[in-house]
Each structure stands twice: as structure tokens, then as C-alpha cells.
């Protein structure tokens, strides 16, 4: 009989329907109920992208697509995918419990975010480990980051180069690539958190492989907590770069994300485009990885390498 290995795929989660918005937001806020204004603001942003974020369906397609890719590429073990979400059901603990019930004794976990941070990925891993320890008999090998995987870098470089084809050749010199990820509270730097450096490395790796002659690093989608977050914010960065260099084309590449969700469809496609329109430049964004076979191959390679070692 083929050995069964759990595949715990963890992600942020998104509301499934309008009624979920309040409890989802309450979970993000550590149990503090948001004000009516906050809920209205979030609802308004979902409305602006045409309804609730497609993230839930994309996460499912990524998890089960990865399971299929792993099982079709070898016959040593059979992987079984379980989705564990941070802010809505199925929660990470629900997924670990389901693995335990299915008699899984060994699992690999991956967070659908390429960069490690004590604030994000570590929090996912800790919840999974705590749940497994409590139940007993289940060992989870966690993947901390996977931004260095050459196939990941190549995938983004190919997408950027494809997007650059839309730009007239004589305007390519006036084009800048903005590489970004979700901002985190600035206090992570006090603990030597590798997150900012990992984004910088990702940008450097990608920049070596693209035809775009300039790039800058930005942060986006920061929380409204009143404390300082990592910057510059992509919108401020756009204004600053235009003011200094008069770039005609801005290519936004939110490499910290892997799907078309609110942070991309609103914070990039709407908010950043407002700024490029304002300064008279053109907005571009390569397609997100979603559940494209090319991206599933990136994840498959990462998981298989972790399992094999």
C-alpha cells in the first residue's frame, strides 16, 4: 500500500459571502469587532472589484492542483491536501484535526506566501504545530520560505517580459518595475526579521532576468493600526518616482502574493492606477500565478524537495 502523506496548504482566507465580512474582520482584529464604518469600507472595496474576492476558489484550485501535480509526478507516496486558513473556516486547527482523523502521521506544510516572517509564516506554522502536538501522533515538516526557488523567479521574469511587450520599444527606457509585498509593522526589524531582505533578494533575482531597465522596491496594503509599517508604500513610491524620473510606464509586480485577491485587484489595479492616471503614466500588471500549471510546478518542486530531504 502506498504511504499517505498530508499536504497542509495554509493561506489567509477570505469571506465566502457578504454575511461573513464582519466575523472575518473580527478575527483579523483579534476578536475586536470592527466599527460599522470599517465594515462599510471593506464592503466598498469588495464592491469596487466586482464582488467578494475570488481568493477562496483560487486557494482550493492551488491546493488540489498541487496535490494532483505531486501525485502524478511520482508513485512513492500519495499526498492528500488539506486547506487550513488563518482567519476563516476551515481554520488551520480544523485542517490538522482532519489529518489526524484520517490517520495521517506525517505531513508537509506550505504557506501560500513565498517569504518568511515571524509575523506571518511563523504564526501559521506555530498554529499547525501546536494543534498537531495537542492531538499527538502527527509530525509536520514546515516549509518556511520558497522565494529562492529558480522556477518561481523565472515564472515572474517571464510574466514581466511578456507584459513589457505591450510597451513601445522606444519607451522601454522610461519604464520602471515596482516589486512589492504586503507591508508589515516596522517593529519586525528590531528582531532581525528576514522578511524585508527576502523581498529585496527576490527583486534582485527577478531584475537580472527582465528587459525592464529600472526597478524599485515598495510595500503595500498596510494595516490601519496606528503604528509605523514598512515603506515606502507603492502609491507614494509611484508619485516619488514619477516626480524624479518622469517614467511613462509602471509595471507593478506584487510578488509577495500568489493570487488575484483584494490586495491586488483593489490596492494595485485600482489605487495604484489612480496614481498613474493622475501623473499621466501607464499602469501595467502581469497576471498573478493563481492556479496556473507553471505555478503549480513551482509549488510541486518546493514540496517534493522538502519531502525528499
Curated annotation (Swiss-Prot):
GO terms for cellular component: cytoplasm. Fe-coproporphyrin III binds at residues 12, 29, 45-46, 53, 124. InterPro entries: Ferrochelatase (IPR001015), Ferrochelatase_AS (IPR019772), Ferrochelatase_C (IPR033644), Ferrochelatase_N (IPR033659). Keywords: Cytoplasm, Heme biosynthesis, Iron, Lyase, Metal-binding, Porphyrin biosynthesis. Its EC number is 4.99.1.9. Pfam families: Ferrochelatase. One of its GO terms (biological process) is heme biosynthetic process. It catalyses: Fe-coproporphyrin III + 2 H(+) = coproporphyrin III + Fe(2+). Pathway: Porphyrin-containing compound metabolism; protoheme biosynthesis. Transmembrane segments: none annotated. It is an enzyme of class 4 (lyase). The keyword Iron applies. It is found in: Cytoplasm. One of its GO terms (molecular function) is metal ion binding. Fe(2+) binds at residues 182, 263. Involved in coproporphyrin-dependent heme b biosynthesis. Catalyzes the insertion of ferrous iron into coproporphyrin III to form Fe-coproporphyrin III. This is Coproporphyrin III ferrochelatase. The gene is cpfC.
